[in-house]
Amino acid sequence: MEEQLIPIQWKDDALVLLDQTLLPNEIVYESFKTAESVWDAIQVMKVRGAPAIGVSAAYGVYLGIKEFAESTEEGFMDEVRKVCTYLATSRPTAVNLFWALERMESVATDNIHLSISQLKNRLLEEAKEIHREDEEINRQIGEHALTLFHDGMGVLTHCNAGALATTKYGTATAPMYLAKEKGWDLKIYSDETRPRLQGSTLTALELQRAGIDVTVITDNMAAMVMSQGKIDAVIVGCDRVAANGDVANKIGTLGVSILAKYYNIPFYVAAPTPTIDLKTSTGKEIPIEERDASEVINRFGKYSAPKESKVYNPAFDVTPHENVTAIITEKGIVKAPFTENLKKLFQ
């Protein structure tokens, strides 16, 4: 088993990120010391995965205000709001981004009686706390998910909701790591996940390094492996869960959920509670990021379609709650009726 890759670290007053755009061929850690550089890292997907984006943005708030010289409370709060508003524009779909930024702004507001120097330190401590909490949340999700799994089962996952998308364990992969600790032998199938291939470049990489049995398949092989009886459960992460249980996740998740429903295979969604957005009634209200055409037709520096091709490249799709068997959170497993039961998590 190789050393686990660490996607997010705080070192020497800087955010240190594993550049995930270079995986699996290069392992490169890069330091970020400004809010602008953090914004860029999120936007170009050097860091990705809803929880990891939220943690990075929280550190980005501190980096954006740490050199701020304004001595008045009002001036400082204006700057905090400005930095939060700016970082919120990096990617629109992952609700953890907005949750983390709102939390940082609230901490500044609640502690406005402190000196400016103390406020800056308080914001850094809050970013570190968000970071610490994420690791514990992931383990709790894994423990709950493991009650739905058994030794020897075949599990399909899509995209990367692993340790590289969070801070440790991952969400959808958390039960895989915990199963390994128990001595179980799960057989994981990882969709490559077009167009950015997070399933093959990230999920397969981290599971392989952890000594977990993982097989890469192309996205259009999912129906085949299900029909062959190789899949006992599907588990995916998510970028946002609406109040009714609709789930926004990486493009292709919807198709996997439809296949799972057809073959009567449980379809589980691993979702930290910060990813659940009760302000969004249904999946129709979730903004879907569209990315550049080059990701589809010029992924590796050579065109795989005519250069002038029209390209539609949504980064996410929405899986209706009817296709979801259960949503697994750190607080427990939620089943239908989702509107009622998701609300109970926050009471």
Curated annotation (Swiss-Prot):
Residues the entry annotates as binding substrate: 48-50, 91, 198, 249-250
Entry's transmembrane regions: none
GO biological process, one term: L-methionine salvage from methylthioadenosine
GO MF term list: S-methyl-5-thioribose-1-phosphate isomerase activity
Annotated pathway: Carbohydrate degradation
Superkingdom classification of source: Bacteria
Entry annotation: catalytic residues: 239 (proton donor)
Catalytic function, reaction form: 5-deoxy-alpha-D-ribose 1-phosphate = 5-deoxy-D-ribulose 1-phosphate
Keywords: Carbohydrate metabolism, Isomerase
EC number: 5.3.1.-
Site, Transition state stabilizer: residue positions: 159
InterPro entries: Deoxyribose1P_isomerase_DrdI (IPR043679), IF-2B-related (IPR000649), IF-M1Pi (IPR005251), IF_2B-like_C (IPR042529), Initiation_fac_2B_a/b/d (IPR011559), M1Pi_N (IPR027363), NagB/RpiA_transferase-like (IPR037171)
Entries under NCBIfam families matching the protein: eIF-2B_rel, PRK05720.1, salvage_mtnA
Family, as annotated: Belongs to the EIF-2B alpha/beta/delta subunits family. DrdI subfamily.
Role according to the record: Catalyzes the isomerization of 5-deoxy-alpha-D-ribose 1-phosphate to 5-deoxy-D-ribulose 1-phosphate, as part of a 5-deoxyribose salvage pathway that recycles this toxic radical SAM enzyme by-product to mainstream metabolites.
Name by which UniProt lists this protein: 5-deoxyribose 1-phosphate isomerase
Name of the encoding gene: drdI
